[in-house]
Each structure stands twice: as structure tokens, then as C-alpha cells.
UniProtKB/Swiss-Prot annotation:
Lineage, highest ranks first: Bacteria, Pseudomonadati, Pseudomonadota, Gammaproteobacteria, Cellvibrionales
Domain of life, per lineage: Bacteria
Gene: rimP
Principal cellular location given in the protein's record: cytoplasm
Name of protein: Ribosome maturation factor RimP
PANTHER family cross-referenced by the UniProt entry: RIBOSOME MATURATION FACTOR RIMP (PTHR33867:SF1)
Family as reported in the entry's similarity comment: Belongs to the RimP family.
Gene Ontology CC terms: cytosol
SUPFAM superfamilies in the record: YhbC-like, C-terminal domain, YhbC-like, N-terminal domain
Gene Ontology terms: biological process: ribosomal small subunit assembly; translation
Pfam families: DUF150_C, RimP_N
Amino acid sequence: MASKQERLTDLIVPVVESLGCELWGLEYLTQGRYTTLRIFIDGPQGVSLDDCERVSRQISAVLDVEDPIDGEYTLEVSSPGLDRPLYTEAQYARYVGETVNLRLRIAVEGRRRFKGVISAIEEGALLLQFDNQTVRLPIETIDKGNLVPRYDDILREHAAGLDE
């Protein structure tokens, strides 16, 4: 039997793709009696507020018909942002050479938290460089991963755009 997250993903992917976006990630969170379905979408040129609104309306309609969530819930649709969460091996591979924050489910070399540069992806593992060393972290052990934005580069690009 498929998990709640898998069932939701199966319902949501066709909707998101039909609107020209990519499902970046999905988080199904319960806290007490409150449930939140958080959906991150992306596109080749990013996504706008209008994209998020369109996707939200369409997903809401599908969820109303299919009713995969018991009780009340909050639906949130947004861009993954500059500090985007990373969920899949393909997403980690897309950011080789970039800095990430990682939290692991189990300790590796006595640590559960790492910040470093992804140097490669190989055989289901991420090679992370930090403190002049490289550690191999199996992707399935990663509980949470986020890209660390390079704000200096972003500000430099923005300033260059203002000069044009």
C-alpha cells in the first residue's frame, strides 16, 4: 500500500506538470490535530505568484474530489526559494559545486549535521567537502537538506542588472 506522501505525489504531479511547472517537493506535516500540505513548485525561469495561485487552485480542486486527507488541512504552494530544500538524488546532483546544510537520520563519523560543498554524487551517495576533508553520505540517510544561497553573488548580479 502506498504511503500518504506517495499517494499525494501521484495526485499532484500531473496537475503541476499540466500547468508547466515541476513538483520540486511535497511535505505532509501533522502537528496535533493540524495538518499542512506544503507543495514546492519550480520552473525553468522560476515561478511567479500567479503560477503558485494557479497550481493551488487546481490542486485544491483535485484534492476536494479525491479526498486523500482526513479532516481539515492547510494547503501551501510556493517556490522552493533561494535556500531550497533538496529531496532527491537528482536535485542534489543539480547542485554539485554548491554549499548545502544537511541533517542526517543517523550519525556519520559521530555527526548528524554537516555544512559543506557537494563535490560529487556517486552510487546513491553524496560526497561532501568541509573542513579540508571529504565525507561520503548515503542519500537515504539525509533527513533534511537545504541549499545555502550565495548572497554575495546574488547581490552582485542584481547590482549589475541595475547598471544596464
